[in-house]
Amino acid sequence: MVRALHEAGFEVIMDVVYNHTCESGPEGPTICWRGLDNLSYYRRTKDKISRLYDTTGCGNTLDFTNTHVTTFAVDSLRYWAKRIGIDGFRFDLAATLARLDGEFTRYHPFLYALRSDILLGNLKMIMEPWDCGPNGWRTGEFGIPFAEWNDRFRDCTRKFWLTDVDRTRSGEYGEMTMQDMATRLCGSSDLFATDPDRGSTASVNYVACHDGFTTADLTMYKSKHNEANGENNHDGTNDNHSVNFGHEGPSSDQIIVQQRQRATMNLLGTLLLSLGTPMLLAGDEFGNSQNGNNNAYTQDNDITWLDWDWLYSTEQTPELKQFNLTSRLITLRKSHDLYSHEDFFTRLSKIGLLKKSDRVHWYLPNGQMPDDSDWTNPAVRSFAMQLLSPDE
């Protein structure tokens, strides 16, 4: 499969989960490292060695302060890269892999092993920069050569186009300012300008992923609907920043349908025209829905299956329309050298200083450039960004 994808021009990034095993908590089955060396492979609380220390939400956490655990993970990665030809890896709950004495550090031996390995250090390595433990959100802190999922981009984009619009319609100010949105559009330097040579491509921008709502569901459901998961709708996050445009779920009202379609393309347009590395959830290109389920990992049925029947329709279906628009956005992005570099086009540096870039211009609807007060004024909802190539 990997060889076939390579022949078709695709790189293959593999999602790997080294933070826990499938044995769950103390009462779980013995089917992995627990049966070999329970005390060495799993993290324990300091006050009671028999108690597992869990930063994954899965009942157990592998102990990456143990040299054998680090060696096991590195050997596994090298096998997939060298023998199978994997081009890179996405590390699930990566903050767990970099905890020493319970605290995250970018200088963790495991991260050092990845950086210094002659094979792995030249591959694409993407971190999910958080876990369920204390101080677990570490977005932007992994450093070179790692890319990281940018949850700030996700939340800012959702709020700006969805919940902030709802608030302004009821006479309130939104949460996101022009400065907030501009920073995300320009590569999130406040998070990723952490090293002299670290660029905007370290920011993996996304609006939706396998966890949470699909992009279409962000515009159809104000609340999660996880009843099919069998946990009385208690599972899954309630922090979705989603709207329903006046009706929960699918609607035949064409005004609502058009509002949702426009909002969806606003989200995808922002994703695909921002500096950084865009990540698109499979199915978002044609408006796939999970019926409001935002924790669908347990569902192997039509809730999560992608329906491609629209491809064979002779009509201009909503799916085909969105697919074509998304394809045009991708083509537009690939046709400009603006997105093939790592510069940050921003006013805000990591240390909070304002710096100008001669490759980005900002305009208000009246054609004037914004002044300093406009950047933090929540009433400023409309602005234009002009990016210039190096030759202009």
Describe the residue ranges of each PLM region.
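Non-catalytic scaffold segments within catalytic domains of secreted glycoside hydrolases
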Residues: Y53-N60, F104, H241-I255, D302-I303, ...
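Substrate-binding/active-site clefts of carbohydrate-active enzymes
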Residues: M1-G85, L93-L119, K124, G136, ...
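Aromatic- and carboxylate-lined catalytic core of secreted/periplasmic carbohydrate-active enzymes
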Residues: Y312-F345
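Acidic, His- and aromatic-enriched active-site or binding-groove loops in soluble protein domains
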Residues: C32-K46, F146-F160, N301-W308
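Conserved, mostly hydrophobic/aromatic
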Residues: L5, D15, W80, F91, ...
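Carbohydrate-binding surface patches
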Residues: W362-E392
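Conserved alpha/beta catalytic core and glycan-binding cleft of carbohydrate-active enzymes
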Residues: G85, L100, R106-A282, F286-G287, ...
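Aromatic- and glycine-enriched glycan-recognition loops and surfaces
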Residues: M1-E11, T71, F104-Y112, Q254-L268, ...
